Amino acid sequence: MRRAPRSRGPGLCSGGPALRSGGPALRARRPGRCRAVAAALLAGLLAGGCGLISGSAMTDTVRPGPKAGYPGRPLTGAQLTVTSKEFTEQIVLGQIMGLVFEAAGAHVIDKTSIQGSIGAREAVKSGTADAAYEYTGTGWITYLGHTKPVIDPQEQWRVVRAEDRKNGLVWLPPSKLNNTYALALNPANQKKLGVHTLSDVAALSHKDPGAVTLCVENEFATRNDGLPGMARAYGMQVPSGNVRKMTGGVVYTETKKGTCALGEVFTTDGRIKAMNLQVLADDKHFFPNYNAAPEINAASLKKYPAMAEVLAPVTRALNNTVAQELNRKVDVDGEDPHQVAKDWLLREGFIREG
């Protein structure tokens, strides 16, 4: 069974409307005035001691496992708070981070599942939380205000890390978990259409325009890093009548059924494997990189430098296959995010009971 949500107020402390957030589709990637205003509001609330979500102590009896990669318990005596956004993948990553800190000896407060798309970042910036997993593309495009993504994943991380230092944040090396956009289709349609890459789709759109039908979310249909930009980058010809707009969950089910030949997906979504959808290669590397990386409060890292050491092996082990499995266990099988994270860390040897 899933854990019941921890109690939180109806809005940002005062009872007003809470900032909206959602699944991976709402990772807050768009820069703009609204983002800046929301960030300022959240920073003020956090600085004033107004919590967006009540925290609770992690109470697992765990120690470093055989693959932890460090001696002893280097965080013994540390008091650390972990946070995350409120969609499944983020919550699981937050639980992973907290469990790793626990195993290394820290006393950990769990403030994962913060409402709003920028609340977790503001918590880390303000020192209300010490660390979170964040996405490099979100940092570059949304938080730092750039419009052109960096194609190379490592370079994307390096430029974000360098620029975000001014905000008192340190980005540790990223994982291979890249939660970005993709197009997918069911096996029958892949066999019928013979497409394996987005370039194949572009070629098909010229040869047989009626064959390229798309199920997408409303946002993807209008974003520059979504359908319009993808069509330009690949030279796709997709008539507006071939595009069906719907909510995220419906996109997956309709793509599985073959209502549309192709559907917009997120590369780490657990429903991809559960529904046996085939993801097409972005062979021109159009979609931005959204690699998950630890984002640490600089003062916290200076006080407890071992945070970097204990997170490194776990971060290196995270990839899209792992994320799809963990997300599926929560979203499809209904398992508890904390237990899913713990089971994975135990299985991989990063922590042990006791």
Residues of each region from the PLM?
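Immediate post-signal peptide segment of exported/extracytoplasmic ligand-binding proteins
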Residues: 56-81, 202-213, 350-354
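C-terminal motif of bacterial Sec signal peptides marking the signal peptidase cleavage site
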Residues: 45-49
